[in-house]
Amino acid sequence: MAPKAAEKKPAEKKPAGKAPAEKLPKAEKKISKDAGGSEKKKKKSKKSVETYKIYIFKVLKQVHPDVGISGKAMGIMNSFINDIFEKLAQESSKLARYNKKPTITSREIQTAVRLVLPGELAKHAVSEGTKAVTKFTS
């Protein structure tokens, strides 16, 4: 919990003179982990951001091999997929809760797809999903 404003003490003002010799901070040695003494700077590892960009690109090349996609359009497609997956997860979670089941199964996902996606798109998604689950289990 953050301290309240009333509890903070104001900083003490000291004269701008020389500090006594005994109060000077001592120089600290940096001890490197490798015994060779060579100091190599470690590269800062980037945080991995999970996106669907490579999969979007693969599907694009399957459907239209001669067509490209801009970075902005790829970002929009990635956001779209994240949004759809979020809606499907929420809906399947609700369905599992309604039926008092602790687990989201393929049945809940399938029903969520039928509820979230419109008409013909839902039919195609269900058939592709069923095909993928069958391939995965066999």
From Swiss-Prot:
- Sites bearing N,N-dimethylalanine, chain numbering: A2
Positions of post-translational N,N,N-trimethylalanine modification = A2
Cross-link (Glycyl lysine isopeptide (Lys-Gly) (interchain with G-Cter in ubiquitin)) at residue(s): K135
UniProt-listed PROSITE patterns: HISTONE_H2B
Descriptive protein name: Histone H2B.4
Protein origin, superkingdom:
Eukaryota
Q: Where is this region: Disordered?
A: 1-48
- The Basic and acidic residues compositionally biased stretches are 1-39
Q: Which residues carry this modification: N6-methyllysine?
A: K4
Where does this protein come from, organism-wise?
A: Arabidopsis thaliana (Mouse-ear cress)
GO cellular component annotations of the record: endoplasmic reticulum; nucleosome; nucleus
